[in-house]
């Protein structure tokens, strides 16, 4: 579903838990970098180019970012609800705890090629 939203241009942003980047000593996404978007069966759906990357506390993610994520009713309330659940699960798997002031990596992108 999410990959399809990206391919049709409905989803032009995503967010990740910053503590997971720290834990894995992984670099943040870079503006100008390309990524292959995969569906739930690991099939390539499209190629995206990162256009913006910024880090903000979870409780400061904007309604504009939530809208660009293109999920649910596109509201900030919906975004917070599903991402708090998702981040809590991901963090608990590695022994970390979600907090509302946790840093979030916000990434915006454009589709450059359909697969």
Residues of each region from the PLM?
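Short, solvent-exposed secondary-structure boundary/capping segments
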Residues: 56-67
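Short beta-strand-centered aromatic/proline hotspots
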Residues: 45-54
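Short, surface-exposed secondary-structure edge patches
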Residues: 23-28
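Loop/turn positions that initiate beta-strands
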Residues: 31-38
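Compositionally biased, charged N-terminal/linker segments
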Residues: 1-22
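Contiguous surface segments at macromolecular interaction interfaces
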Residues: 70-115
